[in-house]
A protein has these predicted regions:
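Short acidic/polar inter-strand loop motif in beta-rich domains
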Residues: 36-39, 84-89, 93-96, 106-120
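Long, compositionally biased, intrinsically disordered segments
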Residues: 8-11, 24, 94-100, 107, ...
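Exposed low-complexity, polar/acidic, P/S/T/G-rich flexible segments that act as propeptides
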Residues: 47-48, 52, 112-128
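Solvent-exposed serine/threonine-rich low-complexity stretches and specific carbohydrate-binding patches
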Residues: 3, 61-69
Length: 128
């Protein structure tokens, strides 16, 4: 369920996907998969993730993830300049409402001291 990007994640580009039908009695750990290249200029990542429930409830989370060690070494897996990160989103979630759950992800990155957000986030090649 990953959405491929062209190496740039535009501020207005909201990545949306529907979750598959899941067992309503089982708890699920949810992750966001993200791949970045050396063109990514930040050591962290801020995301806004919204989950729309079938009966209309919306839960929105603002999340921050560490993307690099203090020395600049990328976190994640991969031997080339592409690193794959499995980012925690929610733990032990149950899906008790019958119907389609929709997840929307957008980035909320800013440069230090800048009030306006980064319009084009370079170095992100897919999210899901």
């Amino acid at each position: 369920m990953n959405k491929e990007l062209s190496g740039v994640w535009k501020k207005q580009e909201i990545i949306t996907f529907n979750l598959p039908e899941l067992d309503s009695l089982k708890g699920y750990d949810l992750f966001i998969n993200l791949r970045n290249t050396n063109d990514y200029k930040f050591n962290n990542l801020h995301l806004i993730v919204a989950m729309n429930f079938p009966y209309g409830k919306i839960v929105t989370d603002t999340l921050e993830y560490k993307m690099a060690k203090p020395d600049g070494t990328w976190l994640g897996n991969g031997i080339s300049d592409v690193k794959e990160n499995k980012l925690w989103y929610k733990e032990n979630v149950t899906f008790s409402e019958k119907g389609i759950y929709k997840v929307s992800i957008s980035h909320a990155m800013r440069n230090n001291g800048d009030v306006t957000g980064v319009k084009n986030l370079d170095g992100i090649i897919d999210v899901g």
